[in-house]
C-alpha cells in the first residue's frame, strides 16, 4: 500500500465512526487483545505479514476497498457517458462471491461477468474436472448476478473443453 491509501482508509474510518476513536475501539473489540488505538493516525491497512489481524479491521478494510472500487467504476462510467451518450456501460466482474463491490456501482447500466469453467481445480470430480470443469459454476454465477440489478450479461465464457486440456 502507499501513503495515500493509508490516509484514505483512515478517512473512511473517521467517517464511519464519527471521528470518535472510542467508537472504533468498541466496534473492533480492541480492548480484548490490548490493541486499543488512541488516534486514527495509528491505524494501518491490514498487512498479510501480521501474525494476528483484527477481524473487524479486515472487514472494514474490505468495505473500504469495495467503496474505492465502486467509486472508481462510477467515475469511469460517468466519464464514458459524458462523451458517448448512447453507449451502454458495464464492467466485467469475476464471480468472487466474497467481494463486496459487486453491484455497488449504480451508474453502470447493467452488470456482466466472466466465467471460465476450467481453471485448475477439479472440485472432487476427478480427472474429468481438469478437462471440462464444473458446469455448476455457470449456474451459481447466474443465480448470484441475476438479483444484483435485474439485467445482467455474460461477458466472457469458456464454452467447453479446451483443446489442449491434456497439457494444462
Where are these regions (language model features)?
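Polysaccharide-binding and catalytic clefts of secreted carbohydrate-active enzymes
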Residues: 1-141
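Aromatic/acidic polysaccharide-binding cleft in carbohydrate-active enzymes
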Residues: 114-127, 152-168
Amino acid at each position: 500500500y502507499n501513503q495515500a491509501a493509508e490516509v484514505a482508509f483512515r478517512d473512511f474510518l473517521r467517517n464511519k465512526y464519527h471521528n470518535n476513536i472510542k467508537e472504533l475501539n468498541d466496534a473492533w473489540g480492541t480492548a480484548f487483545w490490548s490493541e486499543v488505538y488512541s488516534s486514527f493516525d495509528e491505524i494501518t491497512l491490514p498487512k498479510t505479514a501480521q501474525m494476528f489481524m483484527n477481524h473487524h479491521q479486515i472487514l472494514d478494510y474490505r468495505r473500504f476497498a469495495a467503496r474505492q472500487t465502486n467509486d472508481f467504476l462510477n467515475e469511469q462510467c460517468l466519464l464514458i457517458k459524458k462523451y458517448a451518450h448512447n453507449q451502454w456501460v458495464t464492467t466485467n466482474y469475476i464471480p468472487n462471491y466474497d467481494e463486496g463491490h459487486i453491484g455497488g456501482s449504480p451508474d453502470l447500466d447493467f452488470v456482466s461477468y466472466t466465467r471460465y469453467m476450467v481453471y485448475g481445480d477439479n472440485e472432487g470430480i476427478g480427472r474429468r474436472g481438469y478437462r471440462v470443469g464444473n458446469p455448476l459454476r455457470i449456474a451459481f454465477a447466474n443465480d448470484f448476478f441475476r438479483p444484483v440489478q435485474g439485467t445482467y450479461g455474460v461477458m466472457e465464457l469458456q464454452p467447453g473443453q479446451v483443446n489442449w486440456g491434456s497439457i494444462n
